[in-house]
Amino acid sequence: MTKDQREKPKKLTGIAVSPGIVIGKARLVDRSRVKILYQYLIDEKQIKWEVERFEEAVRAAKKQIIAIREKMPKQIQEHSFILDTHLMIMDDSMFHDATVETILKERINAEWALKKSLQKINKLFAEIEDEYVKERVVDVEYVAERVLRCLAGKEQESLFEIKERVIIVAHELSPADTSSIDIGKIMGFITDVGGRTSHAAIIAQSLRIPAVVGLESVTWEVQDGTLLIVDGYTGEVIINPDDNLIIHYQEKHLAQKELESSILRMSHLPAKTVDGYKIAVMANIEFLEEVAAAKDHGAEGIGLYRTEYHYLRGNELPGEEELFSDYKEMVELMAPYPVTIRTLDLGGDRLSPGAGTKTETNPALGLRAIRFCLKNPDIFKTQLRAILRASAYGNIQVMFPMISGLQEFLDTHAILKQVMGELEEKGIAFDRGIKIGIMIEIPSAVSVADILAKHADFFSIGTNDLIQYALAIDRINEHVAFMYQPFHPAILRMIQHVVKVGKEAGITVSLCGEMAGDPLCTSLLLGMGIDELSLNAWGIPAIKQVIRSISMEESKADLERILELDTAKKVREFIEQRMSQLIPYLGRKDLNAEEGSLRGRAQR
């Protein structure tokens, strides 16, 4: 094929979940779902055999997952809990027992019964608003798919079998798939579906291979051997790039690597502005295995430790000793830095069957987080005892989510005081001066922040939920997600108000959520007077570098101008223009994905 006959370049844009740039050939991996062709009734004599057929498929699926876990690359063995979760799902009553019961009661084949169980589970997850928790339904779907393949006698191609350097292209990748990645063979991956909090994204970040998800139709656009460029910084994928584009992205790759190396080398330096203002930059984590990455990237503590995992992974609620052991190890690993533990932020609809709760029609606005804990004090006290006991081993702070007003906080604080009293009576050590904070993520809490500040030791502004609730936007709803605007003037005024009243009360105000990890927001938040930022570990070096490149004086001056602007668009344009002046590499043309021969030809 001559140069003139070559297909024209085409650009798709998805969600960048792991940074880096790779240029290579596509390897299309079939991950299409098994179609249930036969749904049939069985007679009484066949019931026992059909149940055994299902049980045998589950056993076979378990063996496959165990084999994958044993072959996992050492770089991602810390994420083996993902596969452990899949093994537990197969034993979960809603998955396993419900399917067996359906076979027995309705006298239908195992495939049909499993499909019915999956539909019920999907319905439960569909009612959940929390993005991270909602995406966990894919784990159940992956497990069901594996069992269905075992029932049908169909095997998938394993990524272990790939022998050449390629870019994986798939509709979606399961945790078992990404756990099979050999970084000596697989340069990166791109998928039609997926999100920032998917297991595939987490694994890609751990392996440091570029990945873009949510491309919608890439499997229709690409064939085996198609030349691709994957930009894990911007979420762009170039199909059939021309020579100019290849050269451009090669140069961008080298420039980014040079920049990242420089920033990473300085990640353990303090986040101090050029005029001497110091701000703490901490990590958001969910698993103990993430502590090493947090420390390696210069985290000065854990600003948000999500504790929901223990409540999601099994059939029973976690016990006090299990929680205590986890929290104690966490604080010891992070010493001498602080660890802020957020208490349970789920509704009963997502807890283990041991919670004995019922499904709600709108859980996001229902009995969740602190509301659920106040309604279920025994569950709450178990977690509080574990947190308090762990506080004897290091610097722990406790934070309550979804507080809407003072009475809720006072009721919560009363339970904490009660647990403290019980521990004192038993002579169990804990930090009697433990700091108690409030997650500011509901508009009503913003309105009464001045009142709350008189009773709390610190605030943490949870921007993800605050933006959703304040703008009435479901950011994972594709029809309105574009309206999710961190730079909306209303959001900026809310944040500024919380910081102002926090300062007046003499308490620390931190901020977590996607805004904390966005370099475009850093100067703005500094100007407001935020004391701490908490974000994903891999983003810490870049944020610290931005802080070291600007002055508080300039940030405050820019803030005054920003607060006069009346639309999110104007705010973003102003910030982008100012950041390109203050921090040249944020606006460098050689790092700008819009440059090159594809300008004007972007396709979605």
Model feature map: region roles:
Residues 1-333, 339-346, 356, 376, ...:
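Non-catalytic, soluble scaffold/interaction modules
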Residues 260-594, 604:
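Conserved alpha/beta-domain cores
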